[in-house]
């Protein structure tokens, strides 16, 4: 089953890459740009077929993909042009001016990438990452609204029998200890709380807020027990808890009064509505952006995990090999098949979200770097027009290729470090 999970992730990976490149391909053709190649993978070609003026194929190493567009860069002083790969890694070994001059055919003068208006070039380069974002959103919504996610529910897991300090064992209740509000009200394990103080809710966070907001109050609590609705009455205890700021962070040394009922909630798989799903995805995108920004700070710990005896944290950067291992572990978990499928779909969705964010970095040779170049050209031309100066012409992105080589070199080193860590000290979910 472990191997099956890895194979399934590889299929998801290939589809995600093909889907990304399809975004570039479709928009390039829509704007009349000639695309000689559409390839999934690198290395030797396993299969290819030419349709129209594009060769479609699959290569042996399934760790990337690319399309080739004619005239990616403006011609140099000698008037020569080239076709360049959209793949960052393949682009490292291509000369920005001369490698594909021979691919130009009669009539290509009107089918060059750099001759398209900047907004069209932005669309072509953005289309690839955008396809990954769309796929991630669709997969997330499928799981959230179709399967649900594991979260705390309003069902009672256990009831505290007495009110004691947090440092004491809740199972050791002395006769002198006061009964907890939940126990005094007759709340039992298995009860599903339907309403609190007249407010009906099936959301744990909302229920928790209602309890905290009513210290010292006598409130009715409606529960479902064995298919019947029962109204209990609880006197909410007063508790002093640490104050939190607007971001949910604890404010040191400050406390507030909050209500306490005295029970633990059960965890269950809960389907989300559309609004809840959008909120959840927004939080995950924010987390992904924060993790991307924190990558440089995590490199020392990653190095220690790969070459030392440091632990591999759950939020450690993970590459394709590490994600494939996680896919294999999911397939071996002793959980229902539907839950395995949901976890696997979430893994592929997260991978696509990462692809979107990573490719949008405004650095060559990534898609975001070409987008930044097109936007800069648009700004230069607009400024020249306002100031009534001569049109400066296309922005020569090829001049930034030395920077692109440095960026690509850093990416390669980081990828190798992650690969070693994924092999010798992988992130585990079990």
UniProtKB/Swiss-Prot annotation:
One of its GO terms (biological process) is proteolysis. Residues 146-227 form the PDZ domain. It is a multi-pass membrane protein. The active site is at 21. GO terms for molecular function: metal ion binding; metalloendopeptidase activity. Its EC number is 3.4.24.-. PROSITE patterns: ZINC_PROTEASE. Pfam families: PDZ_6 (PF17820), Peptidase_M50 (PF02163). It is an enzyme of class 3 (hydrolase). SMART domains: PDZ. The chain crosses the membrane at residues 122-144, 341-363, 402-424. GO terms for cellular component: plasma membrane. InterPro entries: PDZ (IPR001478), PDZ_6 (IPR041489), PDZ_sf (IPR036034), Pept_M50_Zn (IPR004387), Peptidase_M50 (IPR008915). Disulfide bonds: none annotated. Zn(2+) binds at residues 20, 24. Its main location: membrane. The keyword Hydrolase applies. It comes from the Bacteria. It is found in: Cell membrane. This is Putative zinc metalloprotease SCO5695. It comes from Streptomyces coelicolor (strain ATCC BAA-471 / A3(2) / M145).
